């Protein structure tokens, strides 16, 4: 299934894109020495890991995440699962960093490897789900979104991957638009039972770097998402229907 997103570049959105471009250019020419860049990147990795896992309910504090990032063994009673999630996310971040400057197309295999690292810490690759999943309201338990059937997931993911590689190569659309649409479509398809959000955010980071919007690796988009969580969720829930096939 081809992915042909339907969207409008409004005047307001155009102004935002111009503002983003202005800040990007300022960062690109910012005179920062190598040591400072390395330190800022390490901080960005720490914050990206903390906030992306926090969005999904991880209870570790920044100081605890920092301890794990420095090779600490954890030892936080009752938070063993949280520790594994953080360690796995660090590994997934490290993996996508090896892909930033890769001129070859992004593949479904790589996306599956990213997801596998997120969930298990292994790069063996996770198959797409084989059954139906649903997204429920965390408080009421009611179904708020019904993703596509499992039989359609491979074709939808193939279409998404083909589209994003075309955009990376041809630069038809602004990078922030491509990243946002890719994030939205991945979350909409929900190709896995768990780990979709973390994988989507990592894919977004990879796309931005591939399109020249890495911002020297010194910023954490995940921190922005977490600190604007309601707006983040609302942006992923702007469709007219609770069912994928109904729009």
Named regions from a protein language model:
Residues 1-247:
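FIC/Doc superfamily catalytic core
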């Amino acid at each position: 299934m081809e992915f042909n997103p339907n969207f409008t570049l409004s005047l307001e959105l155009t102004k935002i894109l111009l503002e983003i471009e202005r800040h990007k250019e300022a960062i690109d020419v910012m005179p920062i020495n190598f040591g400072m860049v390395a330190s800022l990147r390490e901080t960005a990795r720490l914050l990206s890991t903390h906030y992306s896992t926090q969005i999904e309910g991880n209870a570790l504090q920044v100081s605890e995440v920092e301890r794990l990032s420095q090779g600490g063994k954890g030892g936080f009673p009752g938070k063993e699962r949280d520790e594994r999630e953080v360690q796995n996310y660090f590994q997934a971040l490290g993996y996508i960093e090896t892909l930033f400057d890769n001129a070859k197309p992004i593949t479904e295999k790589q996306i599956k490897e990213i997801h596998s690292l997120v969930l298990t810490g292994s790069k063996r690759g996770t198959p797409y789900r084989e059954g139906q999943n649903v997204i429920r309201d965390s408080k009421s338990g009611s179904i708020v979104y019904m993703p596509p059937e499992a039989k359609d997931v491979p074709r939808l993911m193939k279409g998404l991957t083909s589209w994003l590689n075309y955009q990376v190569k041809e630069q038809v659309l602004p990078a922030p638009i491509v990243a946002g649409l890719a994030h939205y479509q991945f979350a909409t398809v929900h190709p896995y039972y768990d780990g979709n959000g973390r994988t989507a955010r990592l894919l977004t980071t990879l796309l931005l770097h591939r399109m020249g919007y890495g911002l020297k690796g010194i910023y954490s988009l995940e921190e922005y998402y977490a600190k604007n969580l309601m707006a983040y969720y609302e942006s992923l829930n702007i469709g007219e229907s609770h069912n994928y096939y109904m729009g």
